């Protein structure tokens, strides 16, 4: 018999980081007179996130071991007709897992920030923001209704805007945060349309009530069209996910988010904003399962993102941007799994990816600190001798990312590839090719970065920006010195070690329970009569050890190994090869360097085109038709008519007599003509 979780305990989970954020933001900044210093600021915010993590871990234990569940409304905000707008929580396996991932990664980022942002003037403000980010994501994942989900959705978007543009005196950061904000508005427009359609046709925003009416919705068409209503709803919802989870073509904001400080890059890419779209689709699985058209659309978008965003990672030289493009590619893998109805596999990869991606981002930040804020991997090399902890943990994160057997990424990534192979959707063939090819691409660019940073010759003195401030921030006073690389302080390396542990073991420990047990039983719905993917995976699974051993005979393992070997040869053994290939394939390199010209298209076709259209409508519609014809034309016409009638009013009696005689004559003529 399942137990019920305590509402007050659950409420404390999001409120703890919110209180820490409020105290830091009010008392630790100029807004509140800087009443508290840096030490008290990070103590309060870390304490809030630590409390949230402990309570989340306790909740996960109750859900996984005791079968506890919670689905209640805490507060009714308003009721409009029969539509209630409520604040409530739904806690099941999916929610509990997300709560732990969000709070643990956030806790690591908070600790890391103490060292990374030590000399930044906005230290207290940054801690207030990242705690607020944590609160927003927790409210999103714990929601039991779509209105609260939407508020959490918009809150993470707002705080990401503040954090990407944290250094507001840096023009590129301001451009990046505005870009992220605007691109996400496009996705959010679709998202709110989907929610509105559910509210209009299901009459509720509550998950449980809406899912109970899913079958009824699937029988309806959109009024005035022949489109299936459930398909329109699902595609609208997924457009929202395309924005938040950076799926092609709404992916363009994510690489530019690297303009923010490294700690927030880790939090955005690992556990908060970009995972929101994947979580939302998994939560809405009872709806998506009823539309194969939507599932095909999702699978195609995910496959394009997984493969083609990986290609862009190959030509990046900024260490953070390499990791950013790997995030785009891995989000594509998760999306492909959603399209294959393998929702549990998608969120399983979300979980494993959160740990090793946070590790890789924080490891990149540690390298940036050790290299005195140089971010160009072409001017590094041999760093492992100076930064052993960062080296080992980054290696573990890279091995997890490429899906090395027994590492966490292997269990989730290989499960995605197998799920797509078992899918019978029309898009599955293309998607399977994309995720297989993506294995080689991921291994290649991941170990290109690894080899260029940690191995080979030291190339620090070759950096033309060494004395020109090629930095990712403005807070390091020793960024221009001539000292060599150095290991980061313990407050930076300890989070790396703590993240490396789940990056290695969490997949091995949890795959049986999460994918083939009943952990997601009440949280995720799969129509087994139509979609047999999870049944096929369960039949082929014989334990994590057997799965890892069997992997050495499969294509993904050899593709990953080939990617590592090719990268090793090109960047350590024969460094002249990349330049030669670049010259031979120059047109392709130009396309990749310009990111498929998506930014050019968005700016010159969409943005400038919309502006030109607006100017045209203003000139023709507003100035010519409205002002020129209707407004100004009407008074000119009145003036002309009045000027003409004024001439008739001469004031002379004989003029009026003449008009009267003419009028009588015309009337008599008319009547005579009628009587003929």
Residue ranges and their predicted role:
Residues 2-16, 36-47, 83-101, 139-152, ...:
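Membrane-entry segments of alpha-helical transmembrane domains in multi-pass membrane proteins
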Residues 1-11, 15, 27-128, 201-225, ...:
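Transmembrane helix-loop-helix hairpins at membrane boundaries of multipass inner-membrane proteins
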Residues 47-63, 187-200, 394-402, 495-518, ...:
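Hydrophobic alpha-helical membrane-insertion segments
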Residues 69-84, 206-222, 412-423, 513-547:
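Membrane-interfacial helical/loop segments at transmembrane boundaries in membrane proteins
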């Amino acid at each position: 018999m399942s137990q019920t979780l305590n509402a007050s305990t659950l409420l404390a989970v999001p409120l703890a980081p919110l209180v820490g954020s409020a105290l830091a933001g009010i008392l630790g900044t100029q807004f509140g007179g800087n009443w508290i210093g840096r030490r008290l600021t990070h103590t309060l915010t870390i304490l809030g996130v630590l409390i949230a993590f402990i309570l989340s871990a306790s909740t996960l234990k109750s859900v996984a071991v005791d079968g506890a569940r919670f689905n209640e409304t805490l507060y009714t905000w308003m009721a409009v007709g029969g539509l209630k707008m409520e604040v409530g929580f739904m806690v099941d396996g999916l929610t509990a897992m997300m709560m732990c991932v969000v709070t643990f990664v956030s806790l690591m980022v908070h600790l890391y920030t103490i060292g990374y942002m030590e000399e930044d003037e906005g230290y207290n403000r940054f801690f207030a923001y990242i705690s607020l980010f944590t609160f927003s994501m927790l409210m999103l994942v714990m929601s039991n209704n779509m209105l609260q989900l939407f508020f959490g959705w918009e809150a993470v978007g707002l705080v990401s805007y503040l954090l990407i543009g944290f250094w507001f005196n840096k023009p590129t950061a301001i451009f990046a945060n505005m870009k992220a904000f605007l691109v996400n508005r496009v996705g959010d427009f679709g998202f709110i349309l989907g929610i509105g359609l559910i509210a209009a046709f299901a009459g509720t925003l509550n998950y449980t009530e809406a899912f109970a009416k899913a079958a009824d919705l699937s029988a309806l068409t959109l009024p005035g069209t022949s489109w299936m209503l459930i398909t329109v709803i699902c595609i609208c919802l997924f457009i929202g996910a395309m924005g938040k989870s950076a799926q092609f073509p709404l992916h363009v904001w994510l690489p530019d988010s690297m303009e923010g400080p490294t700690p927030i890059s880790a939090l955005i890419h690992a556990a908060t904003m970009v995972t929101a779209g994947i979580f939302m689709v998994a939560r809405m699985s009872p709806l998506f399962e009823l539309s194969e058209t939507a599932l095909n659309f999702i699978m195609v978008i995910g496959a394009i993102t997984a493969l083609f965003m990986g290609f862009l990672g190959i030509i990046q030289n900024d260490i953070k941007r390499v990791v950013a493009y790997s995030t785009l590619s891995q989000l594509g893998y998760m999306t492909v799994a959603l399209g294959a109805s393998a929702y549990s596999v998608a969120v399983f990869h979300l979980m494993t990816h959160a740990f090793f991606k946070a590790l890789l981002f924080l490891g990149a930040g540690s390298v940036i600190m050790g290299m005195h804020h140089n971010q160009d991997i072409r001017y590094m090399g041999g760093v492992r001798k100076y930064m052993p902890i960062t080296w080992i943990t980054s290696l573990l994160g890279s091995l997890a990312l490429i899906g090395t057997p027994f590492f966490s990424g292997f269990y989730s990534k290989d499960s995605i590839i197998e799920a797509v192979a078992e899918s019978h959707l029309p898009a599955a063939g293309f998607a399977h090719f994309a995720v297989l090819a993506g294995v080689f691409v991921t291994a290649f660019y991941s170990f290109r970065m690894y080899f260029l940073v940690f191995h080979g010759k030291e190339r620090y003195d070759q950096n033309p920006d060494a004395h020109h401030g090629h930095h990712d921030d403005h807070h390091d006073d020793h960024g221009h010195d001539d000292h060599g690389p150095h290991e980061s302080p313990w407050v930076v390396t300890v989070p790396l070690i703590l993240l490396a542990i789940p990056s290695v073991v969490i997949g091995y420990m949890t795959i049986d329970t999460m994918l083939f047990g009943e952990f997601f039983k009440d949280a995720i719905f799969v129509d087994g009569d139509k979609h047999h993917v999870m049944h096929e995976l369960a039949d082929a699974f014989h334990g994590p050890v057997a799965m890892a051993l069997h992997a050495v005979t499969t294509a993904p393992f050899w593709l990953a190994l080939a990617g590592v070997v090719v990268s090793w040869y090109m960047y350590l053994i024969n460094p002249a090869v990349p330049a030669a290939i670049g010259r031979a394939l120059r047109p392709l390199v130009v396309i990749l360097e310009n990111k498929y010209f998506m930014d050019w298209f968005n700016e010159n076709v969409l943005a400038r085109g919309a502006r030109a259209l607006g100017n045209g409508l203003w000139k023709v519609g507003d100035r010519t038709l409205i002002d020129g014809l209707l407004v100004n034309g009407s008074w000119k016409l009145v003036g002309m008519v009045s000027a003409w009638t004024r001439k008739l009013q001469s004031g002379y009696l004989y003029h009026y007599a003449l008009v009267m005689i003419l009028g009588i004559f015309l009337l008599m003529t008319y009547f005579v003509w009628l009587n003929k």
